[in-house]
């Protein structure tokens, strides 16, 4: 690790802002800046020269968190899977390119990455696809025949708790309505491969079409969702939500990381230089509204 004094960076060369179990990380074209407390360390990043990686950045890839907060980088619409090991970029898959992943929910569970829903080949989907690190391929998951059948969608909001994933809303399209917002809450159980509908959302939400980059889990029960100048806090155990308005300086960019009970975000100036700002989660959550009911109608007792 090479210590550096620089604390302001050029956003044009920034590929990802993320973290592992120990450090915040700024991943640039040819280097990784690791941040431990207030110390900055520069490590060279080895990337094999390839035209396929010209778009290796947060606009085109989702970060999926694995064991020990490891980062997997999954192409948003094709499903290619990369990771960084010993400061080298490694491709983990042998899969062919696919256009079925746009707007999908990518979730790590028991040494696999699962893709739920998404848009590809001019239509939304409700398929579940699993990436197996042993055979390095994506394979379709067979859903139990008695499972609830969810509507096709993209850009659903998700929250993982143990063997279950909650899915909140989403959007689909048809000839008559280009953006039909779905008002449902359901779960998927990894153990029996079943969806279950929990209830119908109140029709007063504005966080549809939310990119997965704007979803930050806080604990087993709660996640934050960022949309324009509003942050939503949803409690999936109590089926309540709270919100905080007037936070455009945090919500405007998808470069946000929660690390060690602190929310870090990039403050970008007019010259596209940025500094890392932070706020303690406890201080942030103190300013949220009082809890409101999430659902209008409940089908499944929690």
Describe the residue ranges of each PLM region.
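C-terminal single-pass membrane-anchor helix
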Residues: 1, 297-302
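Conserved short beta-strand element of beta-propeller blades
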Residues: 7-27, 32, 52-76, 81, ...
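Beta-propeller fold detector
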Residues: 42-51, 85-96, 137-145, 196-202, ...
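Beta-propeller blade signature
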Residues: 79-81, 125-137, 158, 179-194, ...
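Generic short beta-strand segments
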Residues: 170-172
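Active-site/pore-lining binding-face segments in mid-to-C-terminal subdomains
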Residues: 182, 222-249, 260
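Ankyrin-repeat TPLH-centered helix-turn motif and closely related helix/turn capping elements
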Residues: 263-272, 276
